[in-house]
Amino acid sequence: MSIWNSLSLSTRYSELPPLLFTHVPPQPLNNVHWIMWNEKLAKRFNLPLDPAADAELLSGFSGEVVPPQFSPLAMKYAGHQFGSYNPDLGDGRGLLLAEIKDKAGASFDIHLKGAGRTPYSRSGDGRAVLRSTIREYLCSEAMFGLGIPTTRALGMMGSDTPVYREGYETGALLLRVAETHVRFGHFEHLFYSNLLAEHKLLADKVIEWHFPDCLDNENPYAVMFNEIVDRTAKMIAHWQAVGFAHGVMNTDNMSIIGQTFDYGPFGFLDDYEPGYICNHSDYQGRYAFNQQPRIGLWNLSALAHALSPLIDKADLDQALEQYEVQLHGYFSQLMRQKLGLITKQDGDSRLFESMFELLSQNSVDYTRFLRELSNVDTHNEQAIIDLFIDRDAAKLWVSLYITRCEKEHETVASRCKKMREVNPKYILRNYLAQQAIDKAQEGDYSELEALSLLLRSPFDEHIEFEHYANLPPSWGKKMEISCSS
């Protein structure tokens, strides 16, 4: 029996109006082969733990042979890119293959990135290169390990197909899994095209599939938007707390369910630099690290405008007004956890602000600082103080911090243990990703495999991987990444 017959597969998105997508067959790569396979995620969907155990997996997921249970399609959407509306967007190199149910009965999209040209490719070749595919695979799993809402990576395939970017590279494929691939830009496309019947139908389906609790409400569309605002605020609060810069927060890269989506020129902070720009095409710093909360609101406002045929302006405004309150609440909660604080006290915001100021002024590594702080008590303050150039200012802050901790009436051991569970020892620094890419391009996937294992449990000590916690070398700091992928 074919493996595809044993899985719970469907193609419900293809039941939507055809102006939302185009059926496109994948264009196979040469000599395609597995590079990575996410065993834990595969198990969740009743897929084999070893992809080599069934040749149909490679031929089907790579697009060489399209199983009858698949219905490959490229989605049509629009979006605001760097603040300007662009109606000519869509899946230019990715295809939604099918939807699959996990063991709990939840439905997930299976999306193949790098599958070839589509009607929405514009001048692109429809391919993804190994370099960018490795980055997305690693980062989506790193974000999952950090507990941040994200799409997932099920597998990665390599090939011998040459793909030209700044120079010749090899084509690769990413199997992305997500609860949905509906973006803010889907609603923008229908709204600006004045396709209001289809616009309402998409909203109805999104509520049915992803916000079923809204169905019993008198105004399900307004409740859905409230939920989108809340989830987006929560996602961005997580980004800011862990030091993640997305790099290209266009509305077509915003998930309707608040999951981190479309990993491109992302970066994690090394030194705490609020204005960090990871995308070298972002000349104005629109998507700088410290601008992400503001851009989240801008994008939600764009979505609100696109949903205005369904929701009263007063309801939209009320939801948008809650965004900053929600984001600040989530962020403050996350920072209290990172600092080992249980209760909410009046001076906490100032404690956080003074910490960020001190980190920025002294160019202190953000991840290293919080991990070291997870081991601080009155007997080993010096380890933290030594991270700073201005040691007097650091000593004063540490003293204030310890005084604040003493108000919690919790043992030092208990506090430190909880802090180590939320402050990662390991993050996907750009230089680590680059080292894995360099080796993979030579056919050595050992670094990729090691990082994948490590980033799934970034809070553990992993003594055998200690060197991955090292600060970046000079060449690896403040790397700006191209959108070219």
From Swiss-Prot:
Mg(2+) binds at N253, D262. InterPro entries: SelO. Keywords: ATP-binding, Magnesium, Manganese, Metal-binding, Nucleotide-binding, Nucleotidyltransferase, Transferase. The keyword Cell inner membrane does not apply. Its EC number is 2.7.7.-, 2.7.7.108. It catalyses: L-seryl-[protein] + ATP = 3-O-(5'-adenylyl)-L-seryl-[protein] + diphosphate; L-threonyl-[protein] + ATP = 3-O-(5'-adenylyl)-L-threonyl-[protein] + diphosphate; L-tyrosyl-[protein] + ATP = O-(5'-adenylyl)-L-tyrosyl-[protein] + diphosphate; L-histidyl-[protein] + UTP = N(tele)-(5'-uridylyl)-L-histidyl-[protein] + diphosphate. ATP binds at G90, G92, R93, K113, D125, G126, R176, R183, D262. Coiled coil: none annotated. One of its GO terms (molecular function) is ATP binding. It holds the Pfam family SelO. It is an enzyme of class 2 (transferase). Its cofactor is Mg(2+); Mn(2+). The active site is at D252. Belongs to the SELO family. Nucleotidyltransferase involved in the post-translational modification of proteins. It can catalyze the addition of adenosine monophosphate (AMP) or uridine monophosphate (UMP) to a protein, resulting in modifications known as AMPylation and UMPylation. This is Protein nucleotidyltransferase YdiU. It comes from Aliivibrio salmonicida (strain LFI1238) (Vibrio salmonicida (strain LFI1238)).
